[in-house]
Swiss-Prot record:
GO terms of biological process kind: collagen fibril organization; endothelial cell migration; endothelial cell proliferation; epithelial to mesenchymal transition; heterochromatin organization; negative regulation of DNA-templated transcription; negative regulation of stem cell population maintenance; negative regulation of transcription by RNA polymerase II
Keyword annotations: Basement membrane, Calcium, Chromatin regulator, Chromosome, Copper, Disulfide bond, Endoplasmic reticulum, Extracellular matrix, Glycoprotein, LTQ, Metal-binding, Nucleus, Oxidoreductase, Repeat, Repressor, Secreted, Signal, TPQ, Transcription, Transcription regulation
Gene responsible for this protein: loxl2b
Protein name: Lysyl oxidase homolog 2B
Disulphide bond pairs: C79-C143, C92-C153, C123-C133, C213-C281, C226-C291, C260-C270, C341-C406, C354-C416, C385-C395, C456-C522, C469-C535, C503-C513, C565-C616, C571-C686, C648-C664, C654-C676, C723-C737
Chain sites annotated for binding Ca(2+): D541, L542, E713, D715, N718, N719
Requisite cofactors: Cu cation; lysine tyrosylquinone residue
Sites of the Lysine tyrosylquinone (Lys-Tyr) crosslink: K644-Y680
Outcome of gene disruption: Morpholino knockdown of loxl2a and loxl2b in the embryo results in increased expression of Sox2 in the central nervous system, particularly in the eye, hindbrain and spinal cord. It also leads to impaired neural differentiation with morphological defects in the brain where the anterior brain is rounder than normal and the eyes present a flatter curvature. Embryo development is also compromised.
Cofactor comment: Contains 1 lysine tyrosylquinone.
Recorded catalytic activity of this chain's protein: L-lysyl-[protein] + O2 + H2O = (S)-2-amino-6-oxohexanoyl-[protein] + H2O2 + NH4(+)
PANTHER family: LYSYL OXIDASE HOMOLOG 2, LYSYL OXIDASE-LIKE-RELATED
């Protein structure tokens, strides 16, 4: 069997690898694609009007949109009057989906054009076509396009669904409706490559795979196909070899040709061309595409595939996404990173971003800060792209009002198509109470055979767990377990096959992390000491407010006898032990305001029964190491430090409309709610750095929150604030405070120390 990639349609759905693809990963799995019942197109009574349906509109997924109907040579819409889920069910099934999830009134997906073909629709849910439902009559309506109805269908397609164009002679703009599409490698040199970049383009229609005739096939069509499979561009290939191959075998052709403009994010957004006579391609051969992979997915002669994915684009980056190829869009302007407002944000603009970063077309254009809110300026608003720009910065936008009327609640994001690398097949979670948790088991080669085994739990941290959850497509890590009580996935899967794992947290696969080679080291062995994880679709994102730090800094000379609590908590310099009770310590004091801009609440790692009571502060502390305060020399050497070793986490204030959930008083629950912030005032214990022994001069002040990565976040790079400061022996000036990574690399280079919160030893 030859290798293939499969995608469920209409529009792009989900990746699934065939048995043959597993072989190309270097191993095979005893898996057979289930046989599907042959789909039988419904037979409609002769008096039923013949219509075609499609989903349209902006800011939508592949399986949702405004309902549009083609009748008598014209596309039109459906009015929302009397519309119900039963009508949505009929529409979704007519489009080849299993069922309807919901429907939306009042032109949620934008206003359509042309006639309103259906009004006051009454369906029972069992009809085979929308035309069989009761209505005012086709074309009889008193509605406006502000009442256009939309539907959301299930991702799952009807097996064997066959598109039947009953209006072939009258329609030239019908969207393509097929079960699946794939790139099937033909040449031996491409059959073992991952990802598959070259081969026949085939569609699955009526349960059978068919080639497409290259008659009238264009580079724009190839551009769309490559984008769907996660590739930013296409290239020419050796046509002579494929013509020789086609002559040796008799292809089975699809009934239609395809017309794409090159702007489409998916093949299903292209339109049908002419119909082939007798399903033959007399003057041509099967369509072949050859795609160019992005840098993160391209093999190199010396190192093979890149071990970790890093955004290296100078003008655009993604932040806050759970997997490679998704995130909040940030652009660099005037040396400072900022976000894009979601006004007019659509798939065209999102696709430009995705291709610019080395991915394919966009699966989704996200709005409303769905992947967390950014900080700093909003650089672009009302972005309009043609779809062929090299960078989103080349698109037109409203230059007069970059951020006018926009807040970070409107930050735009993207989800891009990425190549299927097969990483999910080399890892699994076993024994969990749900698919999001379990013992980590990896597939490795031992003595010429492929075996499942465990990962040593010693030294297992949140960073390794983050890679596991990303590799499995399960979001973010919520817990990393060094000791587990999960059942094994198989009787013989108890042996430790990987140890010494150390990840930076950005890798696409656990095998890309540093780990012991052939000689393992796991003193406690596997079993209950095997590594485990629990994953979550969302995560918090803590961000410090640099302006608060800059505006609240001052010096205080405080006598030692007033610092007993601080001394017990080790918040003073080591020389304080020799300081007489009446002698002062010089303290650099400041306030810090920690915002949760993520998608879920920030909660302490340890359970409340393990919180520590502090008599000095009269409340429980839930995290022993939550923040590091450091004073650095201009070359990055630490000259003083302040550890507010114990913290009580609570909601000090919240954005409008958000209620506080956490407070320290009365043994209350602790944490920071999404949209709230925890303020540590300058006048509380340990909210300082002891600079008694520091000489006058120029320094860098640095704050890092969640420094040990004890709690998973969607973005660790924004957990640091840096400031320039000048100390003359009596006064201190704090200036240029900013979040790490918020400026260009050239600017960050002038601030030694941590560029972001990625520590060097990992």
């Amino acid at each position: 069997m030859l290798a293939l990639w499969s995608i469920s349609f209409v529009l792009l759905c989900s990746w699934r690898l065939s048995y043959a693809q597993y072989e190309h990963l270097g191993f095979a799995i005893a898996y057979q694609e289930p046989e599907q019942d042959l789909y039988t197109p419904p037979e409609l009574p002769a008096d039923t009007p013949r219509i075609q349906l499609r989903l349209a509109g902006e800011k939508r997924k592949h399986n949702e949109g405004r309902v549009e109907v083609f009748y008598e040579g014209e596309w039109g819409t459906v009015c929302d009057d009397d519309f119900t889920i039963h009508a949505a069910q009929v529409i979704c099934r007519e489009l080849g989906y299993f069922e309807a999830i919901s429907w939306s009134p009042s032109s949620k997906y934008g206003k359509g054009e042309g006639r309103i073909w259906f009004d006051n629709v009454h369906c029972k849910g069992k009809e085979k076509s929308l035309a069989q439902c009761e209505s005012n009559g086709i074309g009889v309506s008193d509605c406006k396009h502000s009442e256009d109805v939309g539907v959301v269908c299930s991702d799952k397609r009807i097996p064997g669904f066959k598109f039947v164009n009953t209006l072939t002679n009258n329609i030239n703009s019908l969207n393509i409706q097929v079960e699946d599409v794939r790139i099937r490698p033909i040449l031996a040199s491409y059959r073992k490559r991952i990802p598959v970049t070259e081969g026949y383009v085939e569609v699955k229609d009526g349960g059978k795979w068919k080639q497409i005739c290259d008659d009238e096939w264009t580079q724009m069509n190839s551009r769309v196909i490559c984008g769907m499979f996660g590739f930013p561009g296409q290239k020419r290939y050796n046509t002579r070899v494929y013509k020789m191959f086609a002559r040796r075998r008799k292809p089975s052709y699809w009934d239609y040709t395809i017309n794409c403009t090159g702007k489409e994010a998916h093949l299903s957004s292209c339109t049908l061309g002419h119909t082939l006579s007798n399903s033959t391609c007399e003057e041509g051969t099967p369509v072949v595409v050859s795609c160019i992979p992005g840098r993160a997915f391209a093999p190199t002669p010396m190192t093979g595939y890149k071990k970790a994915f890093r955004q290296e684009q100078p003008l655009v980056r993604l932040r806050g996404g759970a997997v490679v190829g998704e995130g909040r869009v940030e652009v660099l302007k005037n040396g400072e990173w900022g976000t894009i407002c979601d006004d007019n944000w659509n798939l065209l603009a999102a696709t430009v971003v995705c291709r610019e970063l080395g991915f394919g077309s966009a699966k989704e254009a996200l709005s409303g800060g769905q992947l967390g809110q950014g900080m700093g300026p909003v650089h672009m608003n009302e972005v309009q792209c043609s779809g062929f720009e090299k960078s989103v910065t080349e698109c037109s936008f409203n230059m007069e009002k970059d951020s006018e009327g926009c807040s970070h609640e409107e930050d735009a994001g993207v989800k891009c198509n990425v190549p299927a690398m097969g990483f999910q097949q080399r890892l699994r979670l076993s024994g969990g109470r749900n698919p999001f948790e379990g013992r980590v088991e990896v597939l490795v080669e031992r003595n010429g055979s492929l075996v499942w085994g465990t990962v040593c739990g010693e030294g297992w941290t949140t960073m390794e767990a983050m890679v596991v959850c990303r590799q499995l497509g399960l979001g973010f890590a919520s817990n990393a377990f060094q000791e587990t009580w999960y059942w094994p996935g198989a009787v013989n899967a108890d042996a430790v096959v990987m140890s010494g794992v150390r990840c930076a947290g950005t890798e696409m696969s656990l095998s890309h992390c540093l780990h012991h080679g052939e000689y393992l080291s796991c003193p406690k062995g596997g079993g209950r000491f095997a590594a485990g994880v629990s994953c979550s679709e969302t995560a918090p994102d803590l961000v410090l407010n640099p302006q608060v730090v800059e505006q609240t800094t001052y010096l205080e000379d405080r006598p030692m006898f007033m610092l007993q609590c601080a001394y017990e908590e080790n918040c003073l310099a080591s020389t304080s032990s020799a300081t007489p009770a009446n002698s002062p310590r010089r303290l650099l004091r400041f306030s810090s305001q920690i915002h949760n801009n993520g998608q879920s609440d920030f909660r302490p790692k340890i359970s409340r029964e393990n919180w520590v009571w502090h008599d000095c502060h009269r409340h429980y502390h839930s995290m022993e190491v939550f923040t590091h305060y450091d004073l650095l020399s201009t070359n990055g050497t630490k000259v003083a430090e302040g550890h507010k070793a114990s913290f009580c986490l609570e909601d000090s204030e919240c954005d409008e409309g958000i209620e506080k959930r956490y407070e320290c008083a009365n043994f209350g629950e602790q944490g920071i709610t999404v949209g709230c912030w925890d303020t540590y005032r300058h006048d509380i214990d340990c909210q300082w750095v002891d600079i008694t022994d520091v000489k006058p001069g120029d320094y860098i002040f640095q704050i890092v929150i969640n420094p040990n990565y004890e709690v998973a976040e969607s973005d660790y790079t924004n957990n640091i604030v840096k400031c320039r400061c000048r100390y003359d022996g009596h006064r201190i000036w704090m200036y240029n405070c900013h979040i790490g990574g918020s400026f260009s690399a050239e600017t960050e280079d002038t601030f030694p120390g941590l560029i972001n919160n990625q520590v060097t030893h990992r």
